[in-house]
Every structure is written in structure tokens, then in C-alpha cells.
Design a protein with these regions (language model features):
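Short, positively charged and aromatic/hydrophobic N-terminal segments
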Residues: 274, 289-292
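Jelly-roll (double-stranded beta-helix
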Residues: 1-277, 281-284
Length: 292
């Protein structure tokens, strides 16, 4: 993880987690590679594909294959089961795989919203030229200048996906009071003419800042994530992120009762036995159940 809420907490709100799968070459295979069926509740997952392909399916009926440049924005809301594997075509051919998965928290009043899926193709994402030599910014969510992002969100959030050519510089303007995260995926940048950043890195900017400047020492790939802090309690337990322990208990019980839906003919992980002690939860038994 480049960041995770258990370490940074409200500092990164409304964002929770960012996983970066750096470029890796996969050999051709007939085996399924990825993440099997698992649950989520209380937040959204955003998968950005740079290289390779992922086939996704969830219990709300959403799904599809995301290819290079595409984005999958899934709202887990009140509960969803889903799975993500390399697409059969990519697995058969092999090749470079590179992706980001971002978790975005949902406000308390929206945590039980129905699950939904936004399949955003590369052609649906507007791109802005930052200079005349190839630097650009894709507006996945929110707004940059007059350009509106393709994704809809539950709270004010910007997700900007950028690349900048070595020797070029650009200044970004952000809302005062908002969380601003600069995630450098590859390359090397100088921030505000003074701080050198080497990939992979996360920089959390002050909420009092309204702008920041980056200058590329190398060709660089980065994300700018900004959002209005939720200022609500965060209670997380594995694939569930709620506001208190009682809601986590409800999530576990609802999952065990099948309220997250069904993925036909898949192995479903059941958090069947847990123990409450000293104000914490500890799973003491795992079981698998085959649903047909």
C-alpha cells in the first residue's frame, strides 16, 4: 500500500487506501490470476488500468473487462460481493500488468446506498494538455478548470491522473480546506521548488494550501487526489469500513446471512465465527461455502 487509513486516519479523508501494482511481466497461462470472490461494505473502489486487463464481476449485476486507460468505479455501499481476475485474453497472451486501486470512503448517510458499478472507458475520460510536449492530465472524477470528470461521487472528490515530461513544470490549484494527496507512481519530481520526490511516494499537502507546483526531473506518472474531509469516525474491519463497531458487527452478520447477494458457483469466504473482547473483534474461524 502507498497509503492506508489505519496508519494515516483522518489525515487522508475521504480517501482510505491506495494499492499500486507496479509494472510486472506475467507469462502466458491458463490459470486464473487475481482476487476471488470477496465482500465489501461502506466505501468505493476505484481501479485504474495502465497496462493489462482485468475482468470484474459483482453480485449487483455489474461487471466487464477494463483495459489500458479504463477505470472501474464500484460503489460497495450496503454490501456487495465481487471478484477481479486477469482477463482470459490477457492471461492467454501474457504481458505487462500495471494498475492502481483506490478506496474512497462514503459519508455516513450514504454507506448503505445500493451497490452500483461505473464502467468508464478511456474514451470517456477527458484529457487536458499541460504543455506542448506531451504532458497531460486525465480528469477521472471531479473537475479540473472547466473539465468535468467522468465518474459521479458521493462527496466532493477529485481524481486526476497525470503524466509530465522531464524538464516540464506545472502548478495545480486546489480547494482550501480539502485533503490533497500527490501520489508519484513513476519518475522523479521536485515539489514547490524545494522537495525532491522519488517514486513510488505519497505526499500529503497542507489543507491550507491552495496551489502546489511540480517540476519533472524525469518523465513521471502521478495522481492528484483531493477531497472534502468527511470528519466522521472510521471503523474498519478487513473489507468493511463503517463508523462504529456495531455497524461492523452488522456487516459481518449480514454477510453471513447472505444479504450481500450471491455469486453463482463461486467459493464464498464466510467470516463465520468471531469473538468480541476488549472492544475489538477477532475472527477465530474461517469457512468456505459453495453456492450453486
Amino acid at each position: 500500500n502507498l497509503f492506508f487509513y489505519d496508519r494515516l486516519g483522518h489525515t487522508i479523508s475521504p480517501f482510505l487506501l491506495l494499492d499500486y501494482a507496479a509494472p510486472y511481466h506475467f507469462e502466458p497461462t491458463t490459470a486464473q490470476q487475481g482476487v476471488g470472490t470477496h465482500p465489501h461494505r461502506g466505501f468505493e473502489t476505484v481501479t485504474i488500468a495502465y497496462q493489462g486487463e482485468v475482468t470484474h464481476k459483482d453480485s449487483s449485476g455489474g461487471g466487464g473487462t477494463i483495459k489500458a486507460g479504463d477505470v472501474q468505479w464500484m460503489t460497495a455501499g450496503g454490501g456487495v460481493l465481487h471478484q477481479e481476475f486477469h482477463s482470459p485474453e490477457f492471461a492467454h497472451q501474457g504481458g505487462l500488468f500495471e494498475m492502481v486501486q483506490l478506496w474512497v470512503n462514503l459519508p455516513a448517510h450514504s454507506k448503505m446506498t445500493p451497490a452500483k458499478y461505473q464502467a468508464i472507458e478511456a474514451t470517456d475520460i477527458q484529457s487536458i494538455r499541460l504543455d506542448d510536449v506531451g504532458s497531460e492530465l486525465r480528469v477521472i472524477a471531479g473537475q479540473y478548470q472547466e473539465t468535468i470528470g467522468a465518474a459521479t461521487t458521493f462527496s466532493p472528490v477529485n481524481v486526476w491522473d497525470g503524466k509530465i515530461v522531464a524538464g516540464q513544470a506545472h502548478t495545480f490549484y486546489v480547494a482550501e480546506g480539502h485533503t490533497t494527496l500527490l501520489v508519484l507512481l513513476s519518475g522523479e519530481l521536485i515539489l514547490n521548488d524545494e522537495q525532491t520526490i522519488e517514486a513510488p511516494s505519497l505526499v500529503v499537502l497542507s489543507r491550507e494550501q491552495i496551489d502546489f507546483k511540480i517540476q519533472a526531473e524525469q518523465d513521471s506518472k502521478f495522481l492528484v487526489l483531493t477531497g472534502q474531509p468527511l470528519n466522521e469516525p472510521i471503523e474498519g474491519y478487513g473489507p468493511f469500513v463503517m463508523n462504529n463497531k456495531a455497524e461492523i458487527m452488522d456487516a459481518i452478520n449480514d454477510f453471513n446471512r447472505g444479504k450481500f447477494g450471491v455469486m453463482d458457483r463461486q467459493f464464498i469466504l464466510i467470516l463465520i465465527t468471531y469473538k468480541k473482547a476488549h472492544n475489538s473483534f477477532r475472527v477465530i474461524d474461517f469457512r468456505y461455502k459453495v453456492l450453486y
